[in-house]
Amino acid sequence: EISLIDHSQGAIGLRFFGLGPNLNPTNGLNKLQRLLDRNAFWAKNRTINDLKKCLANSDVIVSLWVGNEIVGFGRALSDGVYRGVLWDIVIDQDHQGKGYGKLIVKKLLKAKKIKNTKKIYLMTTNKKFFYSQIDFKEVTTQELLIHEL
């Protein structure tokens, strides 16, 4: 059974109670940590406390479950008018190629805080073709700059 969950802003149920499908406690935060560790080189070794902060400060959070296992995740931030950013979109390697990534991205883009935003940004290392299938376009007139602490 597939469940696509549109969490409330800040994902309180997932953060504090580990809730998954049907509001059942599933140790969801630990499962999210494992999903990221196993499937996203850029998100390995995130601590539970950092994930809680990350979720608390996210505007839109979507998770995809097969039974009681989380197999997909994505989140977004937006000012609701001019700019938004999609973050941490990941699908478990055993579930790729099933359309789950598109489900998550489309759910994020339809969210109230995102749907009327003029420009939605995302960064990808090796999934440019995937995102181009969902109408994201490469921009060569801008450069990505990073300030790291």
Where are these regions (language model features)?
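Short amphipathic alpha-helix that is part of the acyltransferase structural core
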Residues: E1-I48, Q142
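A conserved beta-strand-loop-helix scaffold within acyl/acetyltransferase catalytic domains
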Residues: D50-V90
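Conserved acetyl-CoA pyrophosphate-binding loop and the N-cap/start of the following alpha-helix
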Residues: H95-I104
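Short alpha-helical functional segments enriched in proximate histidine and acidic residues
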Residues: A111
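Conserved active-site alpha-helix within GNAT-family acetyltransferase domains
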Residues: I114-L149
